[in-house]
Amino acid sequence: MKIGCVKEIKNNEFRVGLTPDNVKAYIAAGHHVYIEKGAGIGSGFSDNEYVDAGASLIDNAADVWNLVDMMVKVKEPLESEYPLFREGLILYTYLHLAADKQQMDALLAGKVNAVAYETLQEKDRSLPLLAPMSQIAGRLSIQEGAKYLEKKFGGEGILLAGVPGTPKANVVILGGGTVGMNACKIAVGMGANVTILDISLKRLEELDNMFGAHIQTLVSNDSNVERVLKDADLVIGSVLIPGGSTPKLFKKKYLPEMKNGAVFVDVAIDQGGCGEASHVTTHDDPVYTVDGVVHYCVGNMPGAVPRTSTIALTNATVRYGLEIAAAGLEEACRKSEVISSGVNTYLGKLTNKNVASAHGYDYTDLASLI
């Protein structure tokens, strides 16, 4: 199979879909790999490293798109890339279609066979291709939130951990999954007061066992959320429905009751965000303020640390990519429910229930198409 990788064009996105080590793995399996020149520079991988690994360098992205059977990316294609879609092309990347109707329509119209990292699910219901970026985003959320609590950015002007004789910051984490747990780890490590909310008592028990007296755990409901937000200095939105639209737990009505200069980091923004006042921002212009609360809603947070995040992501993605390349997508889906769970569009049909529900579109069972 011909495998391709192009330079990411999203704002300040420096990750890359394939590393030189990934290229070696595909070449060893008998495939051909085509890399756009400069694709890996932002993550610290030179063109020469890709050539040494066995890849062919291509001068421009369009030629790579037109040449390959499977395109391996990091982030969703942008509108300028839609004309490069074609029937039968396998697109292997993050898609987040529940929050992006325009992209979904373009994939359906182009009859692209799109495999979304974020919906590929193992039998134990874990999300192996979402987990590494969730770990990084969770940790970054506290790092970024602490920065935007500084006065010059519109924050309260407080230090997360305080110093002797001053109060610590109150950190509230909405959602106790991978993002929330990693945010909790960093916030506790920095010495903040941490409260984490989740709808699952089992998950709260797990978090309590992990962090003990260092955190407070609460069942997530409107009353508890509203109560803890009044004293919050930093709020992390880390709610997830795999492939689906995120519930709006951080309501506009809470904002006037919060501290002036409090910070909200909406890590769920890729799936539409868990804040009613949330809209996507960029690394160039990451924050805005609503009713005195600073909102940080960057849609590609791990792109800020591309070396770490590229290696972490591709460590996970290469395994499934090799399975698809070896058998072809159709046969790979027949053999593996895990891979089939990642397929969001196939030959012009929408094959993910949560995405279909988010937009009111018809859902087609992938098994009926392969």
Residues covered by each model-derived region:
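Adenosine-phosphate binding glycine-rich loop
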Residues: 118-159, 269, 274-370
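Hydrophobic beta-strand scaffold residues
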Residues: 33, 57, 91, 114-115, ...
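Rossmann-like adenosine-cofactor binding region
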Residues: 209-291
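Short glycine-/small-residue-rich Rossmann-like dinucleotide-binding loops
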Residues: 69, 75-76, 95-96, 221, ...
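Glycine/serine-rich phosphate-binding loop and adjoining beta1-alpha1 elements at the start
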Residues: 2, 8, 77-169, 298-300
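An N-terminal-biased, well-structured beta-alpha scaffold segment characteristic
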Residues: 2-110
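Glycine-rich phosphate/diphosphate-binding loop of Rossmann-like nucleotide-binding domains
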Residues: 6-42, 152-240, 287
